[in-house]
Amino acid sequence: MAGRLTEAGRAYTLLEASNRIADSWERHYDRLHLHTIKRYSALPYRPFPASYPTYVAKADLLRYYHDYAATYRIRPRFGQRVIRAVHETGRWRITTQRGDQFAAKQLVVATGFNRVPHRPSWPGTADFRGVVAHSRTYQNPEPFLGRPTLVIGMGNTGAEIALDLSEADVPTYLSVRGPVNIVPRDFRGRPVQQTARLVRRLPHWLGDWIGNRVQAAAIGDLSAYGIHTPRESPARQLRERARTPVIDLGTVAAIRAGRIRVVPDVDRFLAAGVQLADGFHLDVSAVVLATGYRTGLADFLEAPDALSGEGIPRTAIARRGLYFVGFDAFASGLLDSIYRDSERVVRAILSAQT
């Protein structure tokens, strides 16, 4: 957004809760590479350097974001966590944790899906003598070496953290609650993201059929290992429920090889481990909660008509000068959706000023 507004010559104020550029990416685990190809993951007006790999690494991504901020003279007001945004007398009134106040005719919310970690509660958690950490704080396997570790949740983050731990010879367990759609990152030498962009132009039934065939050929039947495939195709899951399938980076091979053991849902915590839904006592000394996030928009944004029951914006362009960027899920990936939404939103902002 900031780059597009700068390019359009539109003045803006950018409030940032943290004290650095790209804070959410800085906090990601060390092994991170984008799951989407660089062609569809860049910011406006500035493609990734040709020297970068197809799937950009964390260090390269951070370098790129800092260069972008310098190029477009993006200077956020750091340490300004918004605690209230309300529309009054024709303007948005914004209050930050510092007590500072701002007013604007137009407000763009770009805090994303992953603003507030979701931490489910289980009976007995207080009795557990081990370590419980949310995936947001996970960096690398070092603190878990020699400690049997349970990862709860098999989304993309949980699958990759389990892989990271297993590759460091940490005894690794992965709790999977229900059926999971898993797709390969690449299939027969081609990024699946590119295939998804082509498939979405087809009738849904045909695209779903192709997705199922690719999934069956690349991933296969994992029911013997405790993972079941849902009836809905990966494309339908994304299309109808905005849920991205798990993009496999090697977790499936580790499961088949026995380096990651899949277990059922957790029923309760014990002093020396957890009790699973099937009654089995699993002896672990560390648990990583890969249990997702919530947007937390309703915590500060007083615009209930703009949000769904799950707290997700209903549309990028709402009423009364309110806009959202980064809350949609295209088949081509979240970063590509941010690129598209930001273009629409800037166009709407500029047209509202004429």
Stretches with model-predicted labels:
Residues 1-24, 53-156, 160-354:
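Flavin (primarily FAD) cofactor-binding/catalytic cores of flavoenzymes
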Residues 20-47, 75:
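Redox-cofactor-proximal catalytic regions of oxidoreductases
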Residues 47-53:
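A short acidic, helix-capping loop that chelates divalent metal ions and anchors anionic groups
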